[in-house]
Every structure is written in structure tokens, then in C-alpha cells.
């Protein structure tokens, strides 16, 4: 499968205009059967890489997913990471913060769940909510006990971007590789998926009035995402704006990016020392008796 993932990568310092980024590209598969074959190959590839990551125990991988409602975050996570050993991969979904979490800084609740070395951590939404939904609805800040006198203008958001960049630089320096995915869905495709959630009884549970309410702020969200991607994509911790109107295509792109990221790490299985090899041979002889 040849996917040039660089075309979806946001360059460090690049000013993002999402209107110029595609929400759909030509499919990388020829049929549904071909898609399943490609994805199965990718899942097996990721499973092998995760095993090597765990055995080498030098790096951790953090995958962050952000998107508008109905963009397919859950589906991407489920399909792409389905073949990975559950002991080596943890998924965390961050929704409304608890009362305890609100008493801490905005990065606290997510940093508690960062992956340790040898593991893959997946954040379904993340600390980026604090510069996305909170920027669209700044009244949320009133519940965050932000210090009195703080002005919620441009400088406030730039401080948050800087805090995020500093955190990610620190994590990278200590062995965690971070890859961030924005599933770029068109407004029209979201409408179609919302209608499907209403029209198909088995999908009714996925839809709420809040989803429709947030859709009214579409332009505000796009503006917040543009600023976020522009300010926080870096060479070490890049954002990928993944076209998400085609769910199958999005899954293939994400799987390819993850595989390329993991293959770029200097990983190897631990070498067996002569003493250990001698010990293993002795145990083998005992088993053969």
C-alpha cells in the first residue's frame, strides 16, 4: 500500500487554512474486499511493531485523536488497533472533567494517563479540548478556577499553546513519540452521518441534541482547529489532518502513519548475553531428560 502520508502532515510553523485541506481523497483501495485485506496487513504490521516496542522498552507512543462529532474517531481506534495486544495498548476517552480535575491545571487529568515505556497510549480527545471547545465556549473557563485577573484574550491562548508545546517537548526528550490526528470531516458529511444516526434505530443512541447544538458553531470550531494545528504541530510531535469523509480511507492513512512512526524508532529485541545463553542451554537439556 503506497500512501504518501507527508501530504497530510502539518508542517511546524505552517499557517493552516482548513478550507484548503481535503476532507476526501481518491481511495487507496479498489473494493471493500481489498480494503479489508489492506487493513488486515496493516494491523498485523502494527501488532509486530507493538511487540517490539514492548520488548525494547525504550520508547512509548502516544496517539491523539481530535475531530468534530461523527468524524469516526471511535471507528478508527477500534479498527486500526484491534490486533494489538491489550496489555500493550491503553485507550482513554476524556469527556467532561470531574470536580477534582477542575481543581488542577488543565494538563493534569491527561498527564496521569500517559503511556509508560513499551506501551501505546491512545487519547480519544485530549488536553487539546482546552484550546478547542473551551475556546469556542470560553464561559467554560469560569468552572476551571483560573486565577483572578486572567484576561482570556489572545495572550491567554498563546500561553496554553506554549504549555502544550513544552509538555510535548519534554515527553519527546524522555522517549515518548507523539502523533496527533485531526480527522477532517466536511460539514455536509457530518449532516449525512447525523441523519443516519436518526434514521437507523441501531444508531439512535449515538445522537443527542447537544450534537446538533454544537454543529451551529462549526465555523468557530474550524477557526479554533486552524489556530491549534498552526501553533502546536512540530517536527517531533506532528499533526496530521486526515481526510475523514471516507472512513475506510481514513483508517488506512492513520494505520500507515502509526506504522511509519514506530518503524522510525531505534528498536530491537534485547540481546542474549553468553551467560544467559548458557543458562538457556542448561534448562533446555533438563527439559529433554
Curated annotation (Swiss-Prot):
Enzyme Commission number: 2.7.4.-
GO process terms (BP): ATP biosynthetic process; polyphosphate metabolic process
Sample GO molecular function, one term: polyphosphate kinase activity
Reaction catalysed by this enzyme: [phosphate](n) + ATP = [phosphate](n+1) + ADP
One Pfam family from the record: PPK2
Keywords per UniProt: ATP synthesis, Kinase, Transferase
Keyword set includes Protein transport: no
InterPro entries: P-loop_NTPase (IPR027417), Polyphosphate_phosphotransfera (IPR016898), PPK2 (IPR050038), PPK2-rel_1 (IPR022300), PPK2-related (IPR022488)
Family in the record: Belongs to the polyphosphate kinase 2 (PPK2) family. Class I subfamily.
Purpose: Uses inorganic polyphosphate (polyP) as a donor to convert ADP to ATP.
NCBIfam families recorded: ADPpolyPPhtase, PPK2_rel_1
Protein name: ADP-polyphosphate phosphotransferase
Species in which this protein is naturally found: Rhodopseudomonas palustris (strain ATCC BAA-98 / CGA009)
Amino acid at each position: 500500500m503506497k500512501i504518501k502520508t507527508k501530504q497530510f502532515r502539518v508542517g511546524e510553523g505552517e499557517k493552516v487554512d482548513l478550507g484548503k485541506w481535503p476532507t476526501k481523497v481518491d481511495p487507496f483501495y479498489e473494493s471493500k474486499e481489498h480494503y479489508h485485506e489492506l487493513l488486515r496487513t496493516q494491523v498485523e504490521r502494527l501488532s509486530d511493531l507493538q511487540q517490539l516496542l514492548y520488548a525494547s522498552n525504550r520508547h512509548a507512543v502516544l496517539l491523539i485523536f481530535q475531530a468534530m462529532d461523527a468524524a469516526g474517531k471511535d471507528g478508527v481506534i477500534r479498527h486500526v488497533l484491534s490486533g494489538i495486544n491489550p496489555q500493550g495498548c491503553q485507550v482513554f476517552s476524556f469527556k467532561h472533567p470531574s470536580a477534582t480535575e477542575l481543581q488542577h491545571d488543565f494538563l493534569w487529568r491527561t498527564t496521569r494517563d500517559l503511556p509508560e515505556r513499551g506501551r501505546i497510549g491512545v487519547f480519544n480527545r485530549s488536553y487539546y479540548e482546552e484550546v478547542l471547545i473551551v475556546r469556542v465556549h470560553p464561559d467554560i473557563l469560569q468552572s476551571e478556577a483560573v486565577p483572578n485577573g486572567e484576561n482570556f484574550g489572545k495572550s491567554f491562548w498563546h500561553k496554553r499553546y506554549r504549555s502544550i508545546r513544552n509538555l510535548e517537548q519534554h515527553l519527546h526528550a524522555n522517549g515518548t513519540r507523539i502523533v496527533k490526528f485531526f480527522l477532517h470531516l466536511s460539514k455536509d458529511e457530518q449532516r449525512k452521518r447525523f441523519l443516519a444516526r436518526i434514521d437507523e434505530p441501531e444508531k439512535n443512541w449515538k445522537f443527542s441534541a447537544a450534537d446538533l447544538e454544537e454543529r451551529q458553531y462549526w465555523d468557530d470550531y474550524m477557526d479554533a482547529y486552524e489556530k491549534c494545528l498552526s501553533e502546536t504541530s512540530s517536527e517531533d510531535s506532528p499533526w496530521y489532518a486526515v481526510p475523514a469523509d471516507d472512513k475506510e480511507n481514513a483508517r488506512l492513512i492513520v494505520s500507515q502513519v502509526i506504522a511509519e512512526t514506530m518503524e522510525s524508532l531505534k528498536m530491537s529485541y534485547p540481546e542474549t548475553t553468553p551467560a544467559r545463553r548458557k543458562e538457556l542451554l542448561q534448562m533446555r537439556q533438563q527439559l529433554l531428560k
